[in-house]
Each structure stands twice: as structure tokens, then as C-alpha cells.
């Protein structure tokens, strides 16, 4: 297999403010694996939170590309990708996820099967995705919520964690009034302490919020589990549930775990977490980083396995360089085409 990569800028339509930062753009590194005239693609995006810049991602993807060159075909490379003793093991999960994406895309094209078929789903997956509304003024949030509801969105996720919690309550009230029939998720991104969370959770429950992601600062999963046992709302671990061992510690102790492929290491790792938590009382959420359609697509092929879907990262972009998973009407869909089913907007379809 031959490999090449390209680094691109992904600009957001408008800056997205969350409790710990405001983001207006991020870089993405695209991996292109070629074998016998077919191409498979993967994407890794930069993350200040996880300490990944474009140079680091490019270096690590290049190292993995050198390793991949030693395999006769993508199928054998995919089998070896999860080997803990392989050269380069221990690289950031985002890199492994991008390599796995490219291999799955390539294997699907070689076999004529879409990725969801490779993963055991007989039918093309589709699901209502949440759409994120950042920390902003209530009237701005209300206008956005009304627009999204009119376009078909049935799930909205409102960011929280303002210095004054009253501002978050006002924002959620405004969103609820503008879109009374949508399901509401809330995400403080770890901004609350235990006492604040205990005070606020009943108030947000009264506003019709369905579930809350990561209310407490990450690093104390025992405290999160303690809060979940007392909460009137389902709590979904995100920053406290990075990989399999984190999920194992929290299974049955929180109501949900937000699995992001860039956080856990890809589709295979996500499936292992889903199997681990099944039947424990902890449900699966599929989330994402802000990324292009290429970066979101692998998770869309898993969308039938989750209770909550938050795969809107590509919808936040001013220009998504890839297409193939929908989402603008509130529903993401896996294509029935071989592989990931995505293609570049600026190019003719490649094999």
C-alpha cells in the first residue's frame, strides 16, 4: 500500500464557544491509502484539549504509513492494527482512528460493501443527530433553535458552563420556547462543581432537558458516579470516558458514555466499549469532534447502536470539503456505496 497525506484548514461558520474555550477553526490531516488502484481515506483533526497539532498528527500518520507499507493488503493491516505489540503502538487514538478509517474505506471498496455491512449491519444506518448551540445570548440561541427545528432537527444540544449559571438557564429557556418539541441535551463540558451540579440539575430537568453530558470537571470518575446516582437526569460521561478502561470503571454507574472515535481509537474500539456496557444500564452515545464529513463518516456507520447521536461536526463548518453522510435535515445517513461512501466535493469521484 502507498500512503500520502494532506493538511487542510477547516473554518467554522461561526465561532463555537464552550465552557473552556472558543473555536473558530481547526486543522485536519487527511490520510490517503492506495492499493491496486483503489483509495481509502481517513481524517485526524487537531485538538488543543488532547495536545494534538497538525505537525504531530502528520508525523505520526507518516510513521504508521511506513508500517502499513509492509502489508500485502489492507485486510491484513487492519487485523494487525489492534495488536498492542505492533511498532508504533501507543500512538494517540485519533491517529489510530484515522488509519482504521482509511483501511475500512479501502476494504469496503475492494469487497464492494459499505462499512456498515463490514461491521455486521444488514441495512444502511441513519439516525437523528443532535445539533450543537454554543454559549451565546438567549435571543441568538432561540433564533438558531427555531431555524434548526424548521429544517428538521429533532435533537438540540445546548452548551453550558457560563460564569453565571443563570445565563445557561436563560439560554435553555429560550431554546425550549423557540423549539418546544425538540429533545434537549445539555453539555457543560465539566464546568460545574458537585454542589453547583446538585443545585442546577433539577432546574434543567424542569425545563425538559433529557440528559446532561460531563457536568463535573474530569479526573474524578468516582465523584461523577456519585452524582449520577443522585441526579434527576441521566448523566453521560465524556471527558471522563476516554477509552475502554474508563468505560469499564463507569459501566453501570452513569447513565451514558459518549464514545468519540478520535478519543477511543476508532470503530473497533467503539464496538468493544458498546459490547462492554450493553445490559449494564449505561447507554451508548456517539459523539465527535468538529471535523469534515470524512472524519464523521465512520461513526455514522455505527449509528444504529447508540441511544444518543451527536454527529454534527461537519455541519458546523463554513465549507465541508467532503460529502456523503447528509445531516442538514437533522438526520445523518450511511451511504450504501462501497467503503465509507464519501467523496471530495471539489473532485470527480475517485475509485
For the regions a protein language model found, what residue spans apply to each?
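Metal-dependent enolase-superfamily TIM-barrel catalytic cores that perform enediolate-based chemistry
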Residues: 117-231
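Predominant activation on well-ordered alpha-helical scaffold segments within soluble catalytic domains
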Residues: 62-65, 96, 100, 104-105, ...
Amino acid at each position: 500500500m502507498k500512503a500520502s497525506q494532506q493538511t487542510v484548514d477547516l473554518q467554522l461558520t461561526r465561532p463555537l464557544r464552550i465552557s473552556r474555550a472558543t473555536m473558530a477553526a481547526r486543522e485536519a490531516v487527511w490520510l490517503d491509502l492506495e492499493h491496486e488502484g483503489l483509495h481509502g481515506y481517513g481524517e485526524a483533526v487537531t485538538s488543543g484539549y488532547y495536545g494534538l497539532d497538525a505537525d504531530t498528527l502528520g508525523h505520526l500518520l507518516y510513521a504508521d504509513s511506513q508500517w502499513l507499507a509492509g502489508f500485502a493488503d489492507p485486510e491484513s493491516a487492519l487485523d494487525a492494527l489492534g495488536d498492542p505489540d505492533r511498532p508504533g503502538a501507543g500512538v494517540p487514538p485519533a491517529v489510530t482512528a484515522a488509519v482504521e478509517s482509511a483501511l475500512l474505506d479501502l476494504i469496503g471498496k475492494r469487497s464492494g460493501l459499505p462499512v456498515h455491512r463490514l461491521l455486521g449491519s444488514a441495512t444502511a444506518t441513519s439516525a437523528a443527530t443532535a445539533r450543537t448551540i454554543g454559549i451565546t445570548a438567549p435571543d441568538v440561541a432561540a433564533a438558531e433553535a427555531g431555524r434548526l427545528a424548521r429544517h428538521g432537527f429533532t435533537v438540540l444540544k445546548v452548551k453550558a458552563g457560563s460564569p453565571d449559571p443563570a445565563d445557561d438557564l436563560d439560554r435553555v429557556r429560550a431554546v425550549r420556547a423557540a423549539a418546544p418539541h425538540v429533545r434537549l441535551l445539555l453539555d457543560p463540558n465539566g464546568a460545574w462543581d458537585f454542589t453547583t451540579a446538585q443545585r442546577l440539575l433539577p432546574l434543567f430537568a424542569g425545563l425538559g432537558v433529557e440528559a446532561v453530558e460531563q457536568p463535573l470537571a474530569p479526573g474524578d470518575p468516582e465523584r461523577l458516579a456519585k452524582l449520577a446516582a443522585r441526579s434527576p437526569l441521566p448523566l453521560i460521561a465524556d471527558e471522563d470516558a476516554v477509552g475502554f478502561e474508563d468505560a469499564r470503571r463507569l459501566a453501570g454507574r452513569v447513565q451514558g458514555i459518549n464514545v468519540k472515535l478520535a478519543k477511543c481509537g476508532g470503530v473497533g474500539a467503539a464496538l468493544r466499549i458498546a459490547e462492554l456496557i450493553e445490559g449494564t444500564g449505561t447507554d451508548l452515545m456517539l459523539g465527535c469532534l468538529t471535523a469534515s464529513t470524512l472524519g464523521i463518516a465512520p461513526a455514522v456507520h455505527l449509528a444504529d447502536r447508540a441511544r444518543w447521536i451527536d454527529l454534527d461536526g461537519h455541519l458546523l463548518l463554513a465549507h465541508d470539503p467532503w460529502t456523503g453522510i447528509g445531516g442538514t435535515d437533522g438526520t445523518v445517513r450511511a451511504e450504501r456505496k462501497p467503503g465509507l461512501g464519501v467523496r471530495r466535493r471539489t473532485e470527480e469521484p475517485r475509485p
